[in-house]
Amino acid sequence: MIFISGLTESGMKISENEQTKQHKKMFELSDKLVLELKESDVIIISVPIYNFGPPATLKAWSDLVARVKETFKYNEDGSRVGLLQDKQVYLVITSGGTKINSKEDFLTPWLIHVLNFFGIKNINIIAADQMALDYEKSIKDAEDQISKIT
């Protein structure tokens, strides 16, 4: 996974002609990820909570798909509008000890905010949380949530 850096920021502000091979490689992956989102009607994101928050790779993914004029745009007043409407998202979230939507869960509200930023509002959460405490119950609860969706 490529992580956002000064190289990425500079690449977003210069013309394609001025981009280095490193810039082009980063944008190649970003373009691919953005296209996947645009072409998908249904998106499933399966993610664990690591130390109360998202894994670094999920943060990197969100940075790579947050592209002006691709996944969001600025209005004249500076406000932002997401460009990925009419998507259905299923978040399958697991944790060892963190209760989903508790004060300790920084992943779920962050990820919902990111998806809303892109214009995605139709989000279903399937939680398999606190698996280290009662694995069988966590799996059963997740299966029950899935059966209500399908």
Language-model-detected regions and their locations in the chain:
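Glycine-rich phosphate/pyrophosphate-binding loop and the adjoining helix
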Residues: 101-150
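Hydrophobic/aromatic beta-strand patches that form the interior of the parallel beta-sheet core
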Residues: 44, 90-92, 124-126
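A mobile, often basic/glycine-rich helix-loop segment
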Residues: 59-71
